[in-house]
């Protein structure tokens, strides 16, 4: 038997999950007072990229080959986002004396440096990215974002790798 879902429905489900994840991130920021660090913002961009690709894939409603292309793009975006999440988890695991100093905000960096230099500085991390603001079931937000990206990757690979029903 199996799950009878079309590629379009599967892509729409990913887009909806991404919208929900961004909605929760905004809730955490504006209602719970958890200010996002530069790595958090990059993770949000990753979620939005996956969501936008999923929505475009659903609107395009491609055949088997096209679905694999869209799925590959979504997987690459999710892998990038997961990499940022794992980087932040690593920073959060450092002993206090090894945490990098806090740096300038992302807005200042974007105004002052070229994009590649901004990405390099942000990915090196800073003190605010190592700070743990809150936990859910004992785990930090970057952990749950990494789990989200892993789920998207597994779902997408399953969706485009199965025998297509519609």
Curated annotation (Swiss-Prot):
Gene3D superfamilies membership: DsbB-like
A Pfam family per the record: DsbB
Gene Ontology, cellular component aspect: plasma membrane
Residue ranges, Cytoplasmic side: 1-10, 63-69, 163-166
SUPFAM superfamilies in UniProt: DsbB-like
Disulfide-bonded cysteines: 37-40, 102-129
Keyword Cell inner membrane: yes
Principal localisation: membrane
TM region(s), chain numbering: 11-27, 46-62, 70-86, 144-162
Purpose: Required for disulfide bond formation in some periplasmic proteins. Acts by oxidizing the DsbA protein.
Protein name: Disulfide bond formation protein B
Organism: Chromobacterium violaceum (strain ATCC 12472 / DSM 30191 / JCM 1249 / CCUG 213 / NBRC 12614 / NCIMB 9131 / NCTC 9757 / MK)
Taxonomic placement: Bacteria, Pseudomonadati, Pseudomonadota, Betaproteobacteria, Neisseriales
GN (gene name): dsbB
